[in-house]
Regions:
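Boundary regions of SH3-family modules and the immediately adjacent low-complexity/disordered segments
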Residues: 3-167, 174-177, 183, 192, ...
């Protein structure tokens, strides 16, 4: 049941103007709130032409091969990206998180040591070729976390500060779903990580989460 304001002890509630909102009192079935027999139930939110336009834009962004598309499988896009210093974002993360003066905490609430920084930095010390190679195109075969550095170790700001520490991992950028196209810019020295371009983010993912593709596969995949 909801809690009346006069039942709340003075000083025991962060905001006395608010009361409890018991989720159990509200149906979690969408049909309760949008009845299937309502007059406008089958009316689309956007018309079919608009739906198709946005769907085509999405497909182009992921798999488009023309000079305007930003697909990781698109040689026009990747070639242009490589000419713009593709290593800049990678090197910025290395400088921010692994420089001698950087101060970050691990999951044990202790500061990361210089040795840890050196190990991770050494694993990133690989060259990014500024020439496009079709053989570096790939596809994600499982859900994969995208990391700012090639490590699964979390990296936190001062956990003593409000809004910092767990679970706010500075190295966790995003994730990629199975079927997402990628282009590998480089691999870590231990070969366990690949620094990839995806349609939405560039970062480090586990090598085991990627499968190589060739032109035959790409042609078939795009036609699906």
């Amino acid at each position: 049941r909801s809690t009346a304001k006069d039942e709340i002890l003075t000083g025991s509630y962060i905001d006395p103007t608010k009361t409890r909102f018991p989720l159990a009192d509200y149906s979690q079935s969408v049909d309760k709130w949008i009845p299937p027999d309502s007059a406008d139930y089958t009316i689309p939110v956007i018309d079919s032409a608009t739906q198709q336009r946005y769907f085509s834009a999405l497909k182009s962004h992921y798999f488009g091969m023309d000079s305007e598309a930003h697909s990781p499988w698109n040689d026009f896009y990747i070639t242009a990206l490589l000419k713009k210093n593709a290593a800049q974002a990678r090197d910025a993360s290395i400088k921010q998180f692994l420089s001698d003066g950087s101060t970050y905490w691990g999951e044990n609430f202790r500061l990361y040591t210089s040795r840890w920084k050196e190990e991770v930095r050494g694993n990133t010390d690989t060259q990014i070729d500024n020439i496009y190679h079709a053989s570096r195109r790939g596809i994600m075969v499982r859900e994969s976390l995208v990391r700012a550095l090639p490590t699964d170790d979390p990296l936190f700001n001062d956990p003593r500060q409000a809004g910092e520490g767990y679970p706010f991992d500075n190295l966790q950028m995003s994730s990629l779903r199975p079927g997402t196209p990628v282009y590998t810019l480089t691999k870590s020295k231990d070969q366990r990580w690949q620094y990839v371009v995806s349609p939405a983010v560039t970062g480090w993912v586990h090598s085991e989460d990627i499968a190589s593709t060739d032109q035959k596969f790409i042609t078939q995949w795009v036609l699906l």
